[in-house]
Amino acid sequence: MAQSVTGIQIGGMSFPPSVKPPGSGNTFFLGGAGVRGMEIQGNFVKFTAIGVYLEDKAVPALAVKWKGKTAEELTESVEFFREIVTGPFEKFTQVTMILPLTGQQYSEKVSENCVAIWKKFGIYTDAEAKAIEKFIEVFKDQTFPPGASILFTQSPDGSLTIGFSKDGCIPEVGNAVIENKLLSESVLESIIGKPGVSPEARKSVATRLSELLKESDHCVAGNGKVDECTKEAEVKA
């Protein structure tokens, strides 16, 4: 896979072109980044800066259907972002504070959003209720000053590794692992899905992946599966 990936600076925060997240032995590339904020009395107030990283094999997997699509087409496609969220590759999301936040504030808001959506679609079960309880417990005693980060590593097998960083460094090991596929996927979808909390991150991911998919070398077999005839990624700082 021929990738030219650069870092992004946004909201005063810097996201490097590649990271090795907690809970994974792989190095991921920066798919995109954006801020989360809202209009308050006529001013756009930024709360967090969010970076979305993907495992290298995301590009050939997505190229089968989406290569050649414009950034605008990808930005507006619900199906494209569902494929990112549910695809057979790892994802890593870094949520860095611009304004201070408590763990309780963060976990309760995420939990409320997830449960409301699950109940709407009739997919909220005892397993999800227990996963939400654990999710809230992990954050209970945490505080996040500006520059601190919440880290989510999402495995396609359904595990969600949660980590924290107060010094800008990415730890090798997470603070907790929750085994619930629905929660794992919902955390990312709540950010880049439609409607997600960061339209800016969604647009950034679509724009960068549109270019990476154009550059990608991939072979599609007759069964529609990808044969990776790819080159090593070229990651530019």
From Swiss-Prot:
Which residues are annotated as site, described as Important for catalytic activity? 106
Give the enzyme's EC designation.
5.5.1.6
| Entry annotated with the keyword Isomerase | yes
Give the pathway listed in the UniProt entry for this protein. Answer: Secondary metabolite biosynthesis; flavonoid biosynthesis
Source domain of life is Eukaryota
Q: Does the keyword Isomerase apply?
A: yes
The alphabetized UniProt keywords are: Flavonoid biosynthesis, Isomerase
Instruction: Mention any additional remark.
Output: Part of the biosynthetic pathway for all classes of flavonoids, a large class of secondary plant metabolites, many of which are brightly colored.
Q: What is this protein called?
A: Chalcone--flavanone isomerase 1
From what organism does this protein derive? Fragaria ananassa
